[in-house]
Amino acid sequence: MTNTRKSHPLIKIVNHSFIDLPAPSNISAWWNFGSLLGVCLGLQILTGLFLAMHYTADTTTAFSSVAHICRDVNYGWLIRYLHANGASMFFIFLYFHIGRGIYYGSYTFMDTWNIGVLLLFAVMATAFMGYVLPWGQMSFWGATVITNLLSAIPYIGPTLVEWIWGGFSVDKATLTRFFAFHFILPFIITAMVMIHLLFLHETGSNNPSGMNSDSDKIPFHPYYTIKDILGALFMMIMLMSLVMFTPDLLGDPDNYTPANPLNTPPHIKPEWYFLFAYAILRSIPNKLGGVLALASSILILTLFPIIHLSKQRSMSFRPFSQCLMWLLVANLLILTWIGGQPVEHPFIIIGQLASVTYFFTILILMPSTALMEDKLLKW
């Protein structure tokens, strides 16, 4: 008789995805982030569900309902801070996951890569709308500034913004719809994750060498299940340390002031994980240009499979490309720092230089360096 694990119509799907899945024998800790993102998504949905039980999506009571969750609900403070800091962990892992994909050439799996870019957009949209819900000063003004960017779209822009707002400013209608979208999007993300995995399992995982590993595969369980559990344990230690000791470290103090349309905060800025894109947006002194640069900074990821000119897939054996990769990481850290600074000298020029360097590195330096390395190897 066949093992139920291999014959049951539902269980065999799980079996082929997480148990008997042939995996490369040499994948490093950089391959842990996919499963960690799955853990983060599960945690966010779970904590979000409990928060939604006590939250009210109304401009008059939203701020008070969050205060009520923290003060009066059993372990409400824990659920709220797990959710807020869980989002930060989510983005840290997302950026590591994407960075790993760029370094090891995983973007050559085009279907998996492109659905991944769509996932990034969906997660960013969800996080942005979630930040609006506590209805603090930064929630309100962040929503106003970012939604207002759409007015730069020619002809339909102003109408589109009013349509999204549900009125002539960010108000009750905006908050209600943002809550509705913030609730539904994680489930859409979960479905997209399944498609992401479906495409991945069509090809199998990449590995640090960038070469075909069909001749050297091991079963996912127990090797990578135990490795993923260890990764999740480290993640929980980091997250719980953050939540228990410095829960507001990554937040903005302005968000502890209830939203006031008559009083603008001195520095409007998004959460830390959007600062690099915000810096690129601000570095162009033109509304439409800034919006296009902002969109391009993420959409540029879809070009990686096209601008990959090296005959090697991975950067493991390409020292010059490695230098450029770390230059890009440093550049993104500079952009993140600039995004949180006021718009004044010298931050303006630093932001503009870093923005130019970002696009120049990806579009010009990386492909030309790849060609140079092939030449040096006489390929």
UniProtKB/Swiss-Prot annotation:
PROSITE patterns reported for this sequence: CYTB_CTER, CYTB_NTER
GO terms (BP aspect): mitochondrial electron transport, ubiquinol to cytochrome c
TM annotation in the entry: 33-53, 77-98, 113-133, 178-198, 226-246, 288-308, 320-340, 347-367
Residues in coiled coil: none
GO molecular function: metal ion binding; ubiquinol-cytochrome-c reductase activity
Binding, heme b b562: 83, 182
InterPro entries: Cyt_b/b6_C (IPR005798), Cyt_b/b6_C_sf (IPR036150), Cyt_b/b6_N (IPR005797), Cytb/b6-like_sf (IPR027387), Cytochrome_b (IPR030689), Cytochrome_b_C_euk/bac (IPR048260), Cytochrome_b_N_euk/bac (IPR048259), Di-haem_cyt_TM (IPR016174)
Subcellular location: Mitochondrion inner membrane
Function: Component of the ubiquinol-cytochrome c reductase complex (complex III or cytochrome b-c1 complex) that is part of the mitochondrial respiratory chain. The b-c1 complex mediates electron transfer from ubiquinol to cytochrome c. Contributes to the generation of a proton gradient across the mitochondrial membrane that is then used for ATP synthesis.
Family: Belongs to the cytochrome b family.
Protein name: Cytochrome b
UniProt source species: Ctenomys frater (Forest tuco-tuco)
